[in-house]
């Protein structure tokens, strides 16, 4: 066992050029852990609070010097001397120190940076890779990538309403081949778009961001790219969508697809998703309805919950209270896991545990504003989640996670598992 002797935070930049928090934790053994905190664009109203300075003369108000100061002046003195391996006690101490339900006093970005850096330092102290420190001897499942290759909504400056169009290589024998398949489709998609005279600039998460005639056209160009890469849609590679519907939901209680000029009621949204699922090989829809449209979610789950994966992101915000409500209402069948939505490693693990016990899947995810930190790669293997969302095979802030997963698969050798279609263990195949 080794105790914490130093905690230090600094302001660094994320992949969008905005400031974020990085924390280093040192133990008396000399072990050091470093973690950087991500930041979202389409954030749920119920997420833990990311503390920003608000000083318009610095970084347009997005500085994080307050959060950095909170780590250095408030959190560090409280935690120095604590055992690094006592993650639960450390996270609990920070939650109590903050004293608010949404971490708005110290900032979830301050607290999470410390929480993850402590775990990394403790893993180094134990001589274990982070995934094994988190998950123990049974951490062996490599995730199916849910790879975002075409961007719209808040992740791109185009007329496509649906935020993410993703591919999932369920027919791959292992993670390495899964990544290759996705990369090949990505490059073929670039050629398909180019041949149609469409833009191949990329969005925040590395996916292409062309202007298209409809959201459905996005699906069609991806299917064309899958076939051109030599794969069979629906067998080798399936599709997943993240419409980020909270962003489409307006005060009139309807969903506004401004790119297409269409307005839909919650019932019409459910009909729309059902039509797409019946027409295309879509196996997962994330945030198909808005974060507070519980009745719409209930209807969506009744109609499609046995057939496809329905992921709650803004709906659940990695929060056990929100998830518990969803489970009791029979809403959705999967939770998206974003570390910075809740703000500590312990609470993140609690949400994953609750989801699994209820028969919900868990999909570990990046944010649109990322860094070179690859913690989520270790987390997804550590908890055997089986699915990861971490963007396109482009932009180093995305690729760093995939490369870490390649290293983990290599280290696990013959014990590594890749679930493919079995990652969706709670729906009928």
UniProtKB/Swiss-Prot annotation:
Binds a second Mg(2+) ion via substrate during catalysis. Its EC number is 4.2.1.11. The active site is at 205 (proton donor), 338 (proton acceptor). (2R)-2-phosphoglycerate binds at residues 163, 338, 367-368, 389. Pfam families: Enolase_C, Enolase_N. It is an enzyme of class 4 (lyase). PROSITE patterns: ENOLASE. GO terms for biological process: glycolytic process. Catalyzes the reversible conversion of 2-phosphoglycerate (2-PG) into phosphoenolpyruvate (PEP). It is essential for the degradation of carbohydrates via glycolysis. HAMAP family: Enolase. This is Enolase. It comes from Thermoanaerobacter pseudethanolicus (strain ATCC 33223 / 39E) (Clostridium thermohydrosulfuricum). The gene is eno.
